């Protein structure tokens, strides 16, 4: 089913798929425990293999692939979740391997845990639970509880102001739920657009600068990806602009925090509580009572695991069978719909090679062609009349006939 692409192997022509029998099944490798709901999406044209070197596609959750070597048969990697820090995305791009994720599939699960964390922090629930357990086996528990419960009295979230940093799928759901609970919601997104504003729940006050958000909020929750621009963005300068006693929630990524500055803000009382879904050494070893640590439970619901796996599997299948790309983190989206009876050409190339590839295709006067570029890479998808085409073009990374 994955036929070799008959292009001359001139210098710079790129990576070619080895010949395969027409009736050979597509091979899928897995890491971690993948939900059966996702794997059940695979048709009888697919087989799950243990040897990852045989795989045409790999589905995984949090397994760290950064040190793995990839075979030339590997076409796609599907991350059953949003973050791809465990996948060597840049190296995959260089090899012509499309990396998919599942944005939004776990958004509701993270939203619910974020709300849980906010209320736990506001009402001192973890401390109260821990204290109640110390009463086990003692006499006169009732009077002790009535006498001691006052030390855990907290505040309600009704009427308080929540600041959201990042208004993607999760941020928008948190905003909607917080508004329903009677909170005021301020939102900031570095990539704010008119289209994004239209997706926001009515009632969200959008700010253009974090400096406007920080001093107004009783709670701040961050929902942005971890990258070079956001690493350590929550630092002393940011904390200094916040309200005294702010409750900060991080269900996004641990690398967003400057740990030393965070601990200093907790020690000074600037940050009253820090709720995080990332149990790293910095917070686990800290002697600060205001830290509430969860063991990365954000997407750990049965529903989220099902949704993420189903999305990842479906996207990998669509790329393998039809060449369509949706929700890739390293290649542009492109779609020609289901493949018909004619052969379909799929080309991944450097962006500067795209004009030369398109020149070759334009000579064929094809009716069904899509060409998209993202950063340094271009992706071309075209329906052909013949299974053979000459592509002696430098900069082509992977080309295949489907």
PLM features per residue range, with description:
Residues 111-130, 176-183, 310-324:
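Oxidoreductase and adenylate-handling cofactor-binding alpha/beta cores
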């Amino acid at each position: 089913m994955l036929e070799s692409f008959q292009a001359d192997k001139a210098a710079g022509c790129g990576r070619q798929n080895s010949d395969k029998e027409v009736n050979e099944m597509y091979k899928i490798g897995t890491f971690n425990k993948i939900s059966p709901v996702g794997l059940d999406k695979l048709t009888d044209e697919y087989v799950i293999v243990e040897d990852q070197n045989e795989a045409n596609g790999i589905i995984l959750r949090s397994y760290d692939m950064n040190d793995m070597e990839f075979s030339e048969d590997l076409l796609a990697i599907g991350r059953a979740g949003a973050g791809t820090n465990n996948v060597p995305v840049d190296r995959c791009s260089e090899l012509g391997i499309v990396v998919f994720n599942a944005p939004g599939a776990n958004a509701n699960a993270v939203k619910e845990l974020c709300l849980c964390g906010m209320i736990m922090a506001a009402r001192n629930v973890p401390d109260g639970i821990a204290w109640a357990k110390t009463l086990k086996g003692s006499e006169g528990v009732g009077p002790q509880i009535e006498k001691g419960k006052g030390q855990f009295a907290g505040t309600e979230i009704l009427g308080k102001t929540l600041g959201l940093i990042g208004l993607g799928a999760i941020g928008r759901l948190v905003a909607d739920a917080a508004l329903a609970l009677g909170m005021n919601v301020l939102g900031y997104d570095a990539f704010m657009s008119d289209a994004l504003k239209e997706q926001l729940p009515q009632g969200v006050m959008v700010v253009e600068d974090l400096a406007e958000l920080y001093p107004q909020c009783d709670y701040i929750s961050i929902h942005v990806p971890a990258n070079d621009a956001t690493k350590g963005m929550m630092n002393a300068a940011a904390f200094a602009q916040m309200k005294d006693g702010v409750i900060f929630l991080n269900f996004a990524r641990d690398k967003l925090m400057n740990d030393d500055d965070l601990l200093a803000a907790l020690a000074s009382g600037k940050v009253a509580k820090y709720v995080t879904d990332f149990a790293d050494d910095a917070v686990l070893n800290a002697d600060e009572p205001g830290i509430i640590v969860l063991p990365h439970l954000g997407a750990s619901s049965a529903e989220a695991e099902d949704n993420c796996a189903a999305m990842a599997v479906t996207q990998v299948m669509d790329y393998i069978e039809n060449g369509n790309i949706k929700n890739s983190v390293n290649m542009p989206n492109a779609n020609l719909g289901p493949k018909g009876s004619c052969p379909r050409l799929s080309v991944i190339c450097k962006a500067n090679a795209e004009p030369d590839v398109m020149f070759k295709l334009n000579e064929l006067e094809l009716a069904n062609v899509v060409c998209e570029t993202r950063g340094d890479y271009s992706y071309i998808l075209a329906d052909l009349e013949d299974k053979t085409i000459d592509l002696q073009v430098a900069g082509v990374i992977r080309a295949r006939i489907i």
